[in-house]
Swiss-Prot record:
It is found in: Cytoplasm. This is tRNA uridine 5-carboxymethylaminomethyl modification enzyme MnmG. Belongs to the MnmG family. Residues 631-640 have a biased composition (Low complexity). FAD binds at G13, G14, G15, H16, A17, G18. Its main location: cytoplasm. Pfam families: GIDA (PF01134), GIDA_C_1st (PF21680), SAM_GIDA_C (PF13932). Its cofactor is FAD. NAD-binding protein involved in the addition of a carboxymethylaminomethyl (cmnm) group at the wobble position (U34) of certain tRNAs, forming tRNA-cmnm(5)s(2)U34. Keywords: Cytoplasm, FAD, Flavoprotein, NAD, tRNA processing. GO terms for biological process: tRNA methylation; tRNA wobble uridine modification. Homodimer. Heterotetramer of two MnmE and two MnmG subunits.
Length: 652
């Protein structure tokens, strides 16, 4: 056949997970096919027109550090940029951008169309082909068969998607797009563990019918930040403000009076929604004591009047939506361009995934994005990059990769999913990471770009820029450690201005930089400071953070070293935990269900106690001793009722 039908990797779906997956696989060198039901919607922002935020911005920076597209596309399409938590410590600072939907989508499509090794094709996928426990390809809705040893499914909300507006509902993948019914049915045939989740979106408003004069303006930051490590502020288009208004008691009364017409509160919707992005009816019900909730009016783009009212996601009937909107100050005459709605969809239990995001059930089948129970563009993009990369690595016969929890928020995300699963849509927060002081936005490249280069994800341009930055940080840090500030040479008035008090002894300049209010640029003005100071803001930022937080980071690294021992202790994949005597039935059942790969993963499964982990360590040591002695350890119990360990661990 002249038309290509055999590929190394096939990616199904062109959202944020699918586009990053396809780009990652192609960058590594795999012949990659991206299948989408509509090429015009590649990279589409289905819900809110924003990228980043607390925890989410960290993921975007990590995707960027690994050569992904999201941050760079946001720099080209972002119409407002802000640093959240700017007054707090660097660990929780996060970048957030409003994006022009059209510009963002164009930036993503440009990268897809110009990526070597990547083919785009417009066809919905109806079937997966498998042979035994291996995936072999896909079949489209018109019967076209494409073969590949690795398939990445990034179906978003399309699998058996059902949209609800009031008590009316209809099948759709999102508003205006068809659902993936046949593919959803095929996945059920494969007996993969699954469930239903739901998410929602607010009505869109016409800016020409809004009175912004009675609202609080929310401008972006000045100077304007960038998202990508390679980004420049000059790439940004025109910047626009957002606006803030509030619900009121009348708004709440309207909602309460119509809860019986809500599909959520009338029992029509079965899926669980996102806890941290609740609908307005959910807010009124859960926070009944609050008399007002913020609403952020976000522009959808530079060439449209459409406004996204962040904070009033709803599935109430349209007449109620209109009454709710017009009860809000500044929106008394607002015209709704698109109704809000809720959507239910199938997801698959991520505990059935390996850390590579390959399913445990079928070799070569990878899942990424909302299909794994997550919510958010950023979480999807990060999973997509990892799944696409591992699909390509597998085809090339290379080892799979996933960062550890202490290496990246991506590692935290994947580990949470595969060990704990989800009972509601999963959203990333900085609070989910144990080692967040080391997992900052600003050092994502220092943490991940070298690994990205090793995997084949990072191109020459990014690598050269990274090496220049890394080397500059190392050189300047070494100079500051070698240079001394002498009390006799530094006038007291200058010392008080820069470091807060006169010098009573000699200090290395790096020591002085550790002081809370000491800034690098001012420190370099003191007599004895190294000549030709650094000028790159990213280099200076890393030097200052390293100096001021070194003690905390060192302590955290000590904790990491202890945890690594558990993470590197492998558990047999075929271990029947019911044979490990001393474990409670509950723990045995949970370990047999989840089949953790390491002792560290086992300890993060809900209900598995520290005592159970200690007992498993005893079991592993006894097994190793038996193996060293040449004994058959296949039936080796962890405890046989004898010894102190057996007594202590009984009933764990």
């Amino acid at each position: 056949m002249l038309y290509p039908s055999r590929f190394d990797v096939i990616v199904v779906g062109g959202g944020h997970a699918g586009t990053e997956a396809a780009l990652a696989a192609a960058r590594i060198g795999a012949k990659t096919l991206l299948l989408t039901h509509n090429i015009e919607t590649l990279g589409q922002m289905s819900c809110n027109p924003s990228i980043g935020g607390i925890g989410k911005g960290h993921l975007v920076k990590e995707v960027d550090a690994l050569g992904g597209a999201m941050a760079a596309a946001t720099d080209e399409g972002g119409i407002q940029f802000r640093i959240l938590n700017a007054s707090k410590g660097p660990a929780v600072r996060a970048t957030r951008a409003q994006a022009d939907r059209v510009l963002y989508k164009a930036a993503i499509r440009h990268r897809l169309e110009n990526q070597p090794n990547l083919w785009l094709f417009q066809q919905a996928v109806d079937d997966l082909t498998v042979s035994g426990d291996r995936v072999t390809g896909v079949v489209t809705q018109i019967g076209l068969a494409f073969e590949a040893p690795a398939v990445v499914l990034t179906a978003g909300t399309f699998l058996n998607g059902l949209i609800h507006v009031g008590l009316d509902n209809y099948s759709a993948g999102r508003a205006g797009d068809p659902p993936a019914i046949s593919l959803g049915a095929r996945l059920k045939e494969l007996a993969l563990p699954q469930g239903r989740l739901k998410t929602g979106t607010p009505p869109r408003l016409d800016a020409r019918t809004i009175d912004f004069s009675v609202m609080q303006e929310q401008p972006g930051d000045d100077p304007v930040p960038v998202f990508s490590f390679l980004g420049r502020a000059s790439q940004h288009p025109q910047q626009l403000p957002c606006w803030i208004t509030h619900t009121n008691e009348r708004t709440h009364d309207i909602i309460r009076a119509n809860l019986d017409r809500s599909p959520m509160y009338s029992g029509v919707i079965e899926g669980v929604g996102p806890r941290y992005c609740p609908s307005i009816e959910d807010k009124i019900h859960r926070f009944a004591d609050k008399t007002s909730h913020n609403i952020f009016l976000e522009p959808e783009g530079l060439t449209t009047n459409e406004i996204y009212p962040n904070g009033i996601s709803t599935s109430l009937p349209f007449d109620v939506q209109l009454a709710v909107v017009r009860s809000i100050r500044g929106l008394e005459n607002a015209f709704i361009l698109r109704p809000g709605y809720a959507i239910e969809y199938d997801y698959f239990d991520p505990r059935n995934l390996k850390s590579s995001l390959e399913t445990k059930s079928f070799h070569g089948l990878f899942f990424a994005g909302q299909i794994n129970g997550t919510t958010g563009y950023e979480e999807a993009a990060a999973q997509g990059l990892l799944a696409g990369a591992n699909a390509a690595l597998q085809v090339a016969g290379r080892e799979a990769w996933c960062p550890r929890r202490d290496e990246a928020y991506l590692g935290v995300l994947v580990d949470d999913l595969i060990t704990r699963g989800v009972s509601e849509p999963y959203r990333m927060f900085t609070s989910r990471a144990e080692y967040r002081l080391s997992l900052r936005e600003d050092n994502a490249d220092l943490r991940l770009t070298e690994k990205g280069r090793e995997l084949g994800l990072v191109d020459d341009v990014r690598w050269a820029a990274f090496c220049e930055k890394r080397d500059a940080i190392e050189r300047e840090t070494a100079r500051l450690r070698a240079a001394w500030a002498h009390p006799a040479r530094v006038p007291a008035v200058d010392a008080e201005r820069v470091v807060g008090k006169a010098l009573e002894r000699e200090y290395r300049f790096f020591e002085l930089l550790r002081r809370p209010n000491t800034r690098y640029a001012e420190l370099m003005s003191l007599p004895g400071a190294p000549e030709n100071p650094a000028t790159d803001p990213q280099v200076i930022e890393q030097i200052e953070i390293a100096a001021k937080y070194q003690g905390y980071i060192d302590r955290q690294q000590g904790e990491v070293a202890k945890q690594l021992q558990a993470e590197s202790t492998l558990l047999p994949a075929d271990l029947d935990y019911s044979r490990v005597r001393g474990l409670s039935k509950e723990v045995q059942q949970k370990l047999n269900l989840h089949k953790p790969g390491t002792l560290g993963q086992a300890g993060r499964i809900q209900g598995v106690t520290p005592a159970a982990i200690s007992l498993l360590m005893v079991w592993l040591k006894r097994r190793d001793l038996a193996a060293a002695a040449g004994a058959d350890d296949t039936g080796l119990p962890a405890t046989d009722g004898e010894g102190e360990a057996a007594t202590r661990m009984r009933g764990v």
